[in-house]
Amino acid sequence: MSKDPKGYYKVLELSPGASVAEVRKAYAKQQAKYHLDSPYMKNKLKNAASDEEREKIKKECGEMSARLNSAKSVLFDEKKKKEYDSGMGEFGAHFSGGGYSDIFDIFSQFTGGRGHQRTNKVSSTKYVITVSLRESFVGKVSKFNVRTEKVCTTCDGKGGKDVETCKKCNGNGVYTSRRSLGGFVTLAETRCDGCDGSGHKIKGKPCSTCNGAEYIQDKTMFEVNIKPGVRKGEKIVFEGMGDQRRGHVPGDVIFIIDVQEDSRFERCGNDLVGNIDIPLYTAIGGGVVYFTHIDGRQLEINVSPFRTFDTALKIRNEGFKGSRTGNLILKPNIIIGSESDRAKIMQVLSAPSKKPYGTFTKVNSEFGSMPEPERDHEDASEEGAQSARSFFNNFSFF
C-alpha cells in the first residue's frame, strides 16, 4: 500500500507521514508561492513567451491551488490524516471485512459521509464583460479587481485557535436520519445545525483575522486577454481562482463576453458585413472606391463593372479571425451624383425600350424608404435570424 496514495504529501513537498504542524506550514508556504500576486508567479508570467503560455501558467496555478486544498481537507484533520497514512477508509483498496457499528456506518461507506466525503467544487464566480464590435474584431486586454472569499489562513478556516468536535454530528458536519415507510427504510444525510456543517465549535476567543467567520474577503487583479474574433457568450475561465470552502475544490472565476451592436457593421458567422457608397459610373465601368474598415484601416478597393446591382462586394480574409478567417462583405449603395454627372451618363446609355402593348393608367411616383412588414407576435423572435439570412439570399458574390 502506498504511503501517499493521492500524492497529498508530494504536492506539499513533504515526506509521507509528516506531522500536522509540518503540513500546515508547508500548505501556507505553497499557497503563498502559487498565488498569482506572488513574486514567483509574477516572474513566471513575465517570462512567458506568449499569451497562450501565460494562460497555461494561470491554469496550472489554479490546478495547483485545487490540489493543495484537497491535501489540506485531509491532512489538516487528525482522524482523516490517520486513515490516509494507514491506507484505511476511503483511501484503502476495498471495504474492511467488518466492524461496522450499525447500519449508519455501512450507509456512510456508500454515500461518502463527512468522514469519507467526496471532493466537491465551489460554485464559480461570474462576471460579464461588455465589448464593442470593433473590440471583438481587434481584441483587447482588460484588468479587473475581483473579490473572492478565501479560507482564513490564520485559523485554517476553523474560526478560532481552539476548537472542539461537534458532539451532535461527531465532527462529520452531517448526521444520518432513518425513516420507515411501508416496511422500507430510507436513510438521508442532513446538515448538522449544531455546528452549521463545519464539524466543530469554537472554544474561547474567535480568530482575530476573520472574527470567527472562517473566511476572509480577498481582492485579486485579473488580466483578461480578449482575443480577436471573440464571440458573444464566450467564456474566459480562471480555474481554481474563485471562492474557497474547507474540504472543497476552489471555484473558478469566469468572465462572459457580451458584444454590443454597431451602427455600421454586423457579424454574420466570421464575415463582417457593412455598406459602401459607389458612384454609378464606377459601378457601370469599374474603378476604385475607398472604405474605412472597422479596425480603422483605409482600404482602396478595386471594383469590376457590375453585371447587376443585386451584387455585394466580397473582400477575402478581411473578416473575423477564427478557425476560418471570414470575409468583408459590402452592400453597395449606388450614387447617381450631380446634374452634370447625370447628363454625361444619359449620353452613353441606350434609349429605353419601347412602350409595351396594352392600356396603361398614368400615375406619379416619389422616392421613399421600404416599410417594415407586419409580423405576428410569434414571429418577432425570428427577426434577428431572418435579417441575416435574407441579406445573403438577395445578393450574389464574385
Curated annotation (Swiss-Prot):
Coarsely, its chief localization is cytoplasm
The prosthetic group or cofactor this protein requires is: Zn(2+)
Q: Which residues bind substrate?
A: F144, N145, V146, M221, F222, V253, I254, F255
Give the CXXCXGXG motif repeat ranges. 152-159, 166-173, 192-199, 207-214
Zn finger (CR-type) ranges are 139-219
**Keyword line:** Chaperone, Cytoplasm, Lipoprotein, Metal-binding, Protein transport, Repeat, Stress response, Transport, Zinc, Zinc-finger
- Residues annotated as region Disordered? 367-386
All copies of the J domain together span: 7-88
Question: Where along the chain is Zn(2+) 2 bound?
Answer: C166, C169, C192, C195
The residues that hold Zn(2+) 1 are C152, C155, C207, C210
Q: Which domain of life is it from?
A: Eukaryota
Cellular component, GO, one term: cytoplasm
> Where in or outside the cell?
Cytoplasm
The Gene Ontology biological process annotation of the record reads: protein folding; protein transport
The record's free-text note on cofactor binding: Binds 2 Zn(2+) ions per monomer.
- Does Aminoacyl-tRNA synthetase show up as a keyword for this record? no
Record GO terms (molecular function): Hsp70 protein binding; unfolded protein binding; zinc ion binding
Q: Which Pfam families has this protein been placed in?
A: DnaJ, DnaJ_C, DnaJ_CXXCXGXG
Is Magnesium among this UniProt entry's keywords? Answer: no
Q: How does it assemble?
A: Homodimer.
For this protein, the record's PANTHER family field holds: DNAJ-LIKE-2, ISOFORM A-RELATED (PTHR43888)
Protein family (similarity comment): Belongs to the DnaJ family.
Q: What does this protein do?
A: Probably involved in mitosomal protein import.
The name on file for this protein is: Mitochondrial protein import protein mas5
Which taxonomic lineage does the organism of this UniProt entry have?
Eukaryota, Fungi, Fungi incertae sedis, Microsporidia, Unikaryonidae
